Amino acid sequence: YKNKEKFSADNLTVYEGDAAETVAKLPEPDKVFIGGSGKEMSQILETIAAFPKKIKVVISAVTIETIAETNELLGKYAPDFDVIQATVGRGRKIGSYHIMDTNNPVMIFTAYI
């Protein structure tokens, strides 16, 4: 709720609860963002796939395990998925030079399921 208020996102509805259970109770969405799904991604995607129309799904993944799981599951539900890697770096001075230190790249998967 804090980010919704902070960014005045009046067109955003927040649903609280366990994602795998909550998604099944929602009205059919246009788009779904999945991040930090833990061990429930398979169940979440299965629920989304049961909706009658195709839904745009965006999944963020940081760990190797989540990247592998997402790749496998999207291969099943949407073989033509897209993936990009986003990395942010912060400049740091070393002597008279500056280098970019990067942290945890994020893989962003997009698919219609």
Model-derived segments and their meaning:
Residues Y1-K2, A50, I113:
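Charged/polar positions on well-ordered alpha helices
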Residues Y1-P29:
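S-adenosyl-L-methionine
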Residues S8, K25-D30, T47-K56:
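Short, surface-exposed connector motifs at secondary-structure boundaries
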Residues L12-T13, D30-V32, K56-V57, F81-D82:
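Structural motif
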Residues A20, D30-S42, S60-A61:
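A short SAM/SAH-binding and catalytic strip from SAM-dependent methyltransferases
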Residues V23, M41-S42, I67-A68:
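Short, well-ordered alpha-helical microsegments
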Residues L45-P105:
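C-terminal substrate-binding/active-site "lid" region of AdoMet-derived donor-dependent transferases
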Residues V106-Y112:
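C-terminal edge-of-domain segments
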